[in-house]
């Protein structure tokens, strides 16, 4: 169920829209175009896999979609709002309300427990510690980590840390979740549980997912597979 400050979107409404998205980096005397006038629409409740060779720009794309980097040209709109029109403070608040991130490396805070890491986005949002930790326990249970909530990241296995990172991304009931190899550190059974959780969220809360992966099985599980090649996205046959 969507959080009170997250507007409800019906499945099939456009949740994410990219128009002319371009990212150019300066390398010495040359400009290198990583993304070239890219176009993408993702509907609420849709799960889209992005595949492509290493160095094709997949991580750059995720960073632009999440507002962690600014495009050289073009626009990203999420839940009807343009990221380009937001200052840094407004963008940070928007990310907290609308976007969940799961990276290939978990980026958990080492000095906090799993429970505290998962609750952190809700505390930043202004919820009480009691409210935030109750919701964090709920989502940790959904990823099979209810018994490990008091452990710090250094006391967890790689797969456990990844599950905590996934829980942290989902705890705010985001409109959009951006994932970079989300099941890479998980065994097959746990990965299956995570996929089922994603399926349920997409269907029930109209959360959209964009999943960067090299795993053909994970890609095939999604509603669409898009291939990034030479800065452009095309639907994979």
Swiss-Prot record:
Provide the ABC transporter domain boundaries.
Answer: 16-237
Q: Which UniProt keywords apply?
A: ATP-binding, Cell inner membrane, Cell membrane, Membrane, Nucleotide-binding, Translocase, Transport
> Would I find Thylakoid among this entry's keywords?
no
Q: Does the keyword ATP-binding apply?
A: yes
Q: Where does ATP bind?
A: 52-59
Self-association or partners: how does it assemble? The complex is composed of two ATP-binding proteins (LolD) and two transmembrane proteins (LolC and LolE).
Name of the protein described by the UniProt record: Lipoprotein-releasing system ATP-binding protein LolD
């Amino acid at each position: 169920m969507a959080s009170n400050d997250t507007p409800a979107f019906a499945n099939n409404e456009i949740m994410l829209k990219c128009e002319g998205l371009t990212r150019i980096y300066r390398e010495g005397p040359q400009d290198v175009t990583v993304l070239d006038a890219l176009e993408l629409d993702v509907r609420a409740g849709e799960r889209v896999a992005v595949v492509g060779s290493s160095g094709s720009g997949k991580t750059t794309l995720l960073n632009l979609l999440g507002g962690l980097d600014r495009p050289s040209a073009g626009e990203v709109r999420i839940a009807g709002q343009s990221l380009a029109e937001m200052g840094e403070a407004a963008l940070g608040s928007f990310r907290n309300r609308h976007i969940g991130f799961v990276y290939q490396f978990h980026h958990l805070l080492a000095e906090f427990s799993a429970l505290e890491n998962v609750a952190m986005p809700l505390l930043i949002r202004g919820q009480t510690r009691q409210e935030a930790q109750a919701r964090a326990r709920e989502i940790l249970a959904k990823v099979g980590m209810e018994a490990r909530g008091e452990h710090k990241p250094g006391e967890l296995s790689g797969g456990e840390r990844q599950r905590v990172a996934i829980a942290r991304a989902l705890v705010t009931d985001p409109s959009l979740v951006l994932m970079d190899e989300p099941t890479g550190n998980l065994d097959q059974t746990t990965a299956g549980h995570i996929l089922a959780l994603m399926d349920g969220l997409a269907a029930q809360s109209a959360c959209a997912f964009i999943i960067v992966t090299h795993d053909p099985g994970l890609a095939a599980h999604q509603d669409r597979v898009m291939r990034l090649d030479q800065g452009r996205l095309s639907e994979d046959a």
